[in-house]
Design a protein with these regions (language model features):
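C-terminal recognition in membrane/secretory proteostasis and scaffolding
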Residues: 1-158
Length: 158
């Protein structure tokens, strides 16, 4: 089942030791259910609206470019914030689009050291469109991680 959650702290990532977001469920009632957890995404059903952020257009894989990007994540009690990143590699294969990204945002680096466990699913934005989501941190370099394209996730969901 899916529950609303609050972030209560961060264990900062460092070389060889991925950090993590600490927190817990903020309500006793589930807001949805998970039906499938795959390499292409977690799929389920929501019983209530999941947030107040506006819908965004999805970038075609051909629109994803190397260079500046933004991730949206909640790493403190302040709620969702945008953080600067750079897409450094795009691998298109039969498995779909896979992205490599590096966090460049000073605020995020100061709090988390980069990408930490618990940030999976954080949207990756570029040129006003959602291009994908964070999936993994590179353990030997927490400033760097991987993502999956939104098109790949949507294809898997259909």
């Amino acid at each position: 089942e899916i529950y609303r959650a609050d972030v209560s702290g961060v264990v900062m990532g460092e070389r060889g030791a991925p950090g993590e977001l600490c927190g817990g469920a903020s309500s006793a009632s589930p807001i949805g259910s998970i039906e499938e957890n795959t390499v292409r995404g977690i799929f389920g059903t929501s019983r209530t609206p999941l947030g107040t952020l506006p819908a965004m257009p999805v970038a075609a894989e051909s629109e994803i470019r190397l260079g500046e990007a933004t991730i949206l994540s909640t790493v403190s009690t302040g709620g969702v914030r945008s953080y600067d990143a750079v897409i450094t590699r795009i691998a298109r294969s039969g498995d779909g689009g896979k992205l490599t990204l590096t966090i460049t945002d000073g605020d995020l680096l100061a709090v988390t050291g980069g990408i930490v466990q618990g940030m999976s699913g954080s949207p990756i934005l570029q040129n006003g469109k959602i291009v994908g989501a964070v999936t993994h941190v590179l353990v030997n370099d927490p400033t760097t991680g991987y993502g999956i394209s939104m098109v790949t996730m949507l294809e898997a969901a259909s």
